[in-house]
């Protein structure tokens, strides 16, 4: 009822309801980014409180990313089966349980359950599939820009809440650092429940930029798993799927996996405190916000393969630079700006290519598999970097390896540009 009333008001103002959905997703991603950032803020307080090794916590974060990778392909078809709102509410419930159990943990295996399973399942179900689904369903025009805006909320969450969580760990019990994630999740759940809609047709609207109302199939045969695997069966025959999946694996390896989880401990190894290190992540988050929206704008106007090749190459350079920096204010500020502009700039062109190749319904589902590869890369880096640190007493080899992996991704896109493969942009059948 409230959504219909708001839609009537917006119609009078000449504003499409799609922008309301984009705003809600932005706020939800803002809140979930706080939850996703909690392990990297809590890794040092937990190890100091219980005398554990960094690898004891990083194995939990590695499991979290692994679970995310395994469940990403299920998120979009689950939204198709039970609705976006229901999926969001399930995710919020799991995040609340995961955060509470993390701060109450006193055995190592507790973290495997709270961080690894609860937060991992929540992240897997929602992933970036929510942004891809809403952008694909609600926007025909400006889709790349909208994806950039919605995914940039992850950076905005870091900018706003990570320094707050770090500050809480120093002035009060570190357990209270989860408060921003809990409060934000509850607020966003209420917004989705009151204002969220699955399809524009539920409000008798076409997608933004379209002139015809799209009515989805009233019933989709099969469960979420069968829908997901059926979409995958068609996608794996397309060369674009393998290129996007491999490079997105490298994206996860070199962003959320190593930097997202190990930048603060790396700084601690070089005598940079947790608050100062989180401030650099916040600065990185600000420029990530700018970079991701800029990437969305660029992806609507320029060759997406060229953009992705450039993004990965620049990221590789920044990862190779970090170990050689002096870890002083100037060096880390420069790095945070440079890396922040590129942190998740790969998402808008990747989402757009998925929609172009695989269609309005199958596109978000296939992107779920591609994002699963991303999170698998994150899992490898999250655990592998921590293990490498414990064995070698330094993070330097891990960052070098991540930097060179980015160059592999760049070479893949250069290959595509050089040999001009005849990839059709006609979406395959939307049949489920």
Predicted regions and their residues:
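Conserved MFS/SLC helix-loop-helix module at the cytosolic interface between two early adjacent transmembrane helices
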Residues: 70-109, 299
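Extracytoplasmic
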Residues: 17-54, 71-75, 162, 257-264
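C-terminal transmembrane helical hairpin of 12-TM major facilitator-type secondary transporters
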Residues: 276, 282-288, 294-353
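Helix-loop-helix hairpin linking two adjacent transmembrane segments in secondary transporters
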Residues: 150-203
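Extracytoplasmic gate region of multi-pass secondary transporters
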Residues: 39-46, 233-295, 381
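Interfacial helix-cap and linker-helix signal at transmembrane-aqueous boundaries
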Residues: 46-47, 78-79, 160-172, 267-268, ...
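Hydrophobic core of transmembrane alpha-helices in multi-pass small-molecule transporters
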Residues: 98, 110-126, 249, 331-345
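Cytoplasmic helix-loop-helix junction between adjacent transmembrane helices
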Residues: 115-152
């Amino acid at each position: 009822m409230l959504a219909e009333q708001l839609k009537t008001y917006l119609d009078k103002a000449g504003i499409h309801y799609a922008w309301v959905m984009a705003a809600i997703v932005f706020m939800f991603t803002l809140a979930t980014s706080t939850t996703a950032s909690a392990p990297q803020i809590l890794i040092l307080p937990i190890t100091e409180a219980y005398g554990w090794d960094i690898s004891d916590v990083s194995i939990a974060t590695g499991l979290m990313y692994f679970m995310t990778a395994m469940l990403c392909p299920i998120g979009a078809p689950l939204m198709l089966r039970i609705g976006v709102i229901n999926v969001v509410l399930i995710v919020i419930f799991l995040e609340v349980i995961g955060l509470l159990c993390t701060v109450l943990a006193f055995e190592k295996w507790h973290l495997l359950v709270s961080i690894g399973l609860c937060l991992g399942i929540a992240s897997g179900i929602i992933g970036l599939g929510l942004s891809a689904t809403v952008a694909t369903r609600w926007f025909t025009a400006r889709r790349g820009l909208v994806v950039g805006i919605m995914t940039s909320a992850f950076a905005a969450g870091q900018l706003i809440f990570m320094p707050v969580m770090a500050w809480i760990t120093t002035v009060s019990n570190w357990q209270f650092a989860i408060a921003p994630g809990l409060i934000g999740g509850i607020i966003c759940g209420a917004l989705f429940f009151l204002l969220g809609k699955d399809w524009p047709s539920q409000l008798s609207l076409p997608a933004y930029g379209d002139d015809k109302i799209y009515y989805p199939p009233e019933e989709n045969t099969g469960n979420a798993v069968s829908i997901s695997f059926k979409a995958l069966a068609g996608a794996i025959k397309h060369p674009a799927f393998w290129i996007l999946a491999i490079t997105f694996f490298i994206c996860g390896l070199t962003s959320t996996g190593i930097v997202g989880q190990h930048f603060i401990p790396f700084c601690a190894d070089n005598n940079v405190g947790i608050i100062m290190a989180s401030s650099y992540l916040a600065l990185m988050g600000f420029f990530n916000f700018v970079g991701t929206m800029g990437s969305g704008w660029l992806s609507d106007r320029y060759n997406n393969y060229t953009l992705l090749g450039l993004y990965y190459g620049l990221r590789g350079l920044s990862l190779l630079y970090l170990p050689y920096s002096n870890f002083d204010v100037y060096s880390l500020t420069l790095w945070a700006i440079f890396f922040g502009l590129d942190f998740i700039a790969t998402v808008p062109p990747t989402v757009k290519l998925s929609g172009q190749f695989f269609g309005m319904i199958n596109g978000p589902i296939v992107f779920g598999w591609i994002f699963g590869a991303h999170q698998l890369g994150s899992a490898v880096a999250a655990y592998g970097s921590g293990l490498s640190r414990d064995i070698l007493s330094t993070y330097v080899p891990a960052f070098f390896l991540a930097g060179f992996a980015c160059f592999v991704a760049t070479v893949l896109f250069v290959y595509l540009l050089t040999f001009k493969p005849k990839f059709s942009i006609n979406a395959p059948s939307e049949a489920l």
